[in-house]
Regions:
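Charge-dense, helix-prone N-terminal extensions
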Residues: 4-132
Length: 132
């Protein structure tokens, strides 16, 4: 029987997206968040390595995912040194970290949350009050 770590390590990157600007990722979510089941985003974690070029920082990737009710999970290193972050829609009643709860409150205050992102919060009983 394969362990969970073996499954994650061997998980294939099937749909790698590369963006140079956060607005491009947001546009992708606007067009695909309701229908796609997963994607992988080329990104960097803390400091932009030279080999990353103009790929997105982690914070931009995770914030846009939260805005649309998606979550980051598996992280893999690409052959060229960049990282690939797996994103997928949140499951109902999934666990929310305190950090992601705070991020959503901040995103709501900045006017970036979408109805899909709010619905994911509602489904998890973590309603953020907002003005319409």
């Amino acid at each position: 029987m394969l362990s969970i770590l073996s499954l994650i390590w061997n998980m294939e990157i099937t749909y790698l997206l590369e963006f140079t600007h956060r607005a491009q990722l947001r546009k992708w979510f606007e067009q695909h968040a309701a229908s796609d089941k997963e994607c992988w985003i080329a990104m960097y974690r803390v400091r932009r390595p030279a080999e990353c070029g103009d790929c997105l920082p982690y914070i931009d990737v995770v914030e846009e995912a939260l805005c649309f009710g998606w979550i980051d999970s598996t992280l893999k290193r690409l052959p060229d040194g960049r990282l690939a972050q797996r994103l997928s829609p949140r499951r109902k009643r999934s666990h929310w970290t305190e950090l992601n709860k705070q991020r959503c409150a901040d995103l709501e205050a900045r006017g970036l949350m979408t109805d899909a992102g709010r619905q994911a919060l509602y489904n998890s009983s973590l309603i953020i009050h907002h003005s319409l």
